[in-house]
Amino acid sequence: MSTANRTFTGLLGTKLGMTQVWDENNKLIPVTVVQITPNVVTQVRTPEVDGYGAIQIAYGQIDPRKADKPSTGHFDKAGVTPRRHLTEVRTADFAEYTLGQEITVGAFEPGTKVDVVGTSKGKGFAGVMKRHNFKGVSASHGSHRNHRKPGSIGASSTPSRVFKGMRMAGRMGGERVTVLNLVVHSVDAEKGLLLVKGAVPGARGRIVFVRNAVKGK
C-alpha cells in the first residue's frame, strides 16, 4: 500500500538513554527513553499546490535572535516561535492539521509498533574486521603482519581498477539508521516521555524521529 493512502503519525524527540523496567509478567525489559516535547505544525502540503499531501513539524526551541530571516518568516506565517529541527510526515489525513497545532507524545499508544530513525554513533576510522566483519588472515602458516588486512581488492591488468562498492577500511558510523517495528512499552504524556522496547540509533542527547511502523501489522 502506498504511503500516500495511509495515515501516519511522526514526531521528533531526544534520546535520553536506556533503562530497565518490569512488565506485567515480572520480566525485566530493556527500554529506550525518548523525550518528546510538543511538536508544532509549521506547514501543510496539499496535492493541489505541492503535488502530495504532508505536514511539516518543528521541534526544539531556540533563541529567536539566532534564526535567519527566511526561517523567521516561515515560522511567523505558522504563528509559532522559531524551532531548531524540521521534518515532513506524509499522511493521508493532512487536511485535518492546522498551522500552529501541537502534537504531543500522546499520539502513540502502548503496545503499538513504531519505527525510529536516528544517526548512529560515530566510530572513527575503522579497519575491515571491525567495519565489515571480515574474518582476517590466518594467524600462522607463513602469514606475516597480515592478520587484520583485507586481502586482495581486485585483479591486476584485468580489470586494472578497483570495483565500486569494494568493502575497505574507512570511517565507520555516523550514518542514518532506521530500526523497524519496535514496541511502545509505555507513554508518560505528563512528562513527555516515550519508552520503547529495545535500542534505538544514536548517542544520548541525539535527535530521533519516531513514526508509526511502516511494515508493522
Curated annotation (Swiss-Prot):
GO terms for MF: rRNA binding; structural constituent of ribosome
Function recorded in the entry: One of the primary rRNA binding proteins, it binds directly near the 3'-end of the 23S rRNA, where it nucleates assembly of the 50S subunit.
The keyword Mitochondrion is assigned to this record: no
Highest taxon of source: Bacteria
CC per GO annotation: cytosolic large ribosomal subunit
GO biological process, one term: translation
The protein's name: Large ribosomal subunit protein uL3
Keyword RNA-binding recorded: yes
Spans annotated as Disordered: 137-160
Designated gene of the protein: rplC
Family that this chain belongs to: Belongs to the universal ribosomal protein uL3 family.
Keywords, alphabetical: Ribonucleoprotein, Ribosomal protein, RNA-binding, rRNA-binding
Subunit structure: Part of the 50S ribosomal subunit. Forms a cluster with proteins L14 and L19.
Matching InterPro entries: Ribosomal_uL3 (IPR000597), Ribosomal_uL3_bac/org-type (IPR019927), Ribosomal_uL3_CS (IPR019926), Transl_B-barrel_sf (IPR009000)
Organism this protein belongs to: Clavibacter sepedonicus
